[in-house]
Amino acid sequence: MSNLSLLDLGFFIAETAASPKHVGGLLIFKRPPKAPAAFVKNLYRAYLAATDVKPPFNRIIQFSMNALPHWQATDAIDMNQHVFYHVLPKGQADRKSVYDFVSKLHTPMLDRSRPLWEVHVIDGLPEGLFAIYHKMHHAYADGVTMSRWTAEGFSTSPTDMELTPVWTLKHGGYGTRRAKANNELLQMTWKEVTGNTRRFLGIGRLAAMLFLESIKLTKNAIALPFVSSAK
């Protein structure tokens, strides 16, 4: 069990269907020379078989009226709920069609009943291209961190054929450096709050965050797209 930082808790409190708090990244690749027709589908199958899921990708958010919000690790991960395969229709495989398709994938909130991430493998692009779209909750990582984690899974040589999906890598320091100071403050504050006061605090915090969004002070604050060259 791992407690949330104040910042991460804020993302959950302010999250709504109209203002989801996840980040996404689109990667477009060229197939290797002489790759078989099923290369992209085989990549998807290899992703499904990569079931050694490391933190934070094995964590589910848990809320309770008598305990701190916290992450709960789970071994019951159905990869079919996290890894998806798509083929773009013929005639709709240009770059704009890819971007439109990914925007539809990006719109819905992630399901809080399971780990908060998805990977979509997209086939059918022209000129031997294919795409991979990553989606994960901002409480897991911000956009820059997601880009860095993804880059850590890339091979450094065309002869290196080992597949290392982002969810199978150990991400050093997760839940320690990022949250340690904030967690201590959260625990001290939470102990001072009991009964109805705790409920009012939660409602007040929620109202404040939603009010800030309603007057456009925080709306889309984490939804700005960017191009990363993370190494």
Can you describe what each PLM-predicted range is?
Residues 7-15, 19-29:
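M16 family metallopeptidases and their MPP-like homologs
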Residues 1-7, 26-37, 45-55, 59-231:
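Soluble acyl-CoA-dependent acyltransferase catalytic core bearing the H(X)4D motif
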Residues 40:
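Active-site regions of oxyanion-processing enzymes, predominantly non-cytosolic
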